[in-house]
Amino acid sequence: MGHLKSLFTILFLIAMSSTVTFAGKIPAIIVFGDSSVDAGNNNYIPTVARSNFEPYGRDFVGGKPTGRFCNGKIATDFMSEALGLKPIIPAYLDPSYNISDFATGVTFASAATGYDNATSDVLSVLPLWKQLEYYKEYQTKLKAYQGKDRGTETIESSLYLISIGTNDFLENYFAFPGRSSQYSVSLYQDFLAGIAKEFVKKLHGLGARKISLGGLPPMGCMPLERATNIGTGGECVGRYNDIAVQFNSKLDKMVEKLSKELPGSNLVFSNPYEPFMRIIKNPSSFGFEVVGAACCATGMFEMGYGCQRNNPFTCTNADKYVFWDSFHPTQKTNHIMANALMNSTFPHFL
């Protein structure tokens, strides 16, 4: 029995760490969401929720800070590369790119946003409805660039990824009294799931067919939450993790039901919780040495402008860390998570 368990572990690690390829199956990846998938849109709007400065991007191509909340690539960049597309997915608002670049992939995501408009209002970032408006604009540009028929085909054949929701709880519901005075946690989850449902329906109405709706990670294990979990020795905040599991279950059921209602749709719920929790519970198996603190600065509270260049506490090798800043994973973690989610999700679309 022990040998079988060891064999399973080896096979699992190979699947998680190897580079997955699905080349030639998808013409483009279209992305909506928050900082987990923002490649720099916030650089071009008036908000403090930015990361277009060092040490962010220090392990990116050319050591360039792009606005990704990471030391390097984010998960969607690795997914694009695995599909045989470009090695990164550019931000829609970045003027250094144009429709020829966006034709194979684009992200409308905005760091610090959420399903709830009240969440995006906190730091004046792009709400989900505005991301959808930009997508409509993108469709017009794409059809002008590729021609109406080919543009329509690209829209219908592209893969749509949605990664959002953590900020609704950690930066809104539990941070300010507004929503928590209006809703219980369960009712707020239902409120957000309803917004997610309507967003997917609107995407489908605009021609999207292959849609992956992402769930929440174990958000109680982020370094920031561990650091504020006084009296536990820096353990994960169990309540936040429980909320993530509950919300993921509601999204999963919603997607299953909605997929039967929308004609020609291929909807999949992509759950990052378990693969991320496996990293957190057994970091050494993935080559990590530090899981409870981040690489940047003290590793407990800093993100964004708190992660300043030349901070003497910032680590020298981010690959040893699960988290880059107090809220976001390192490039290495993003790569592992991208492979895990591609293995579980992409076969449904190919």
From Swiss-Prot:
Keywords: Glycoprotein, Hydrolase, Lipid degradation, Lipid metabolism, Secreted, Signal. It is an enzyme of class 3 (hydrolase). It comes from the Eukaryota. Residues 1-23 form the signal peptide. The active site is at 35 (nucleophile), 325, 328. Glycans are attached at residues 98, 117, 343. It is found in: Secreted. GO terms for molecular function: fatty acyl-[ACP] hydrolase activity. GO terms for cellular component: extracellular region. Its EC number is 3.1.1.-. Its main location: secreted. One of its GO terms (biological process) is lipid catabolic process. Belongs to the 'GDSL' lipolytic enzyme family. This is GDSL esterase/lipase At2g04570.
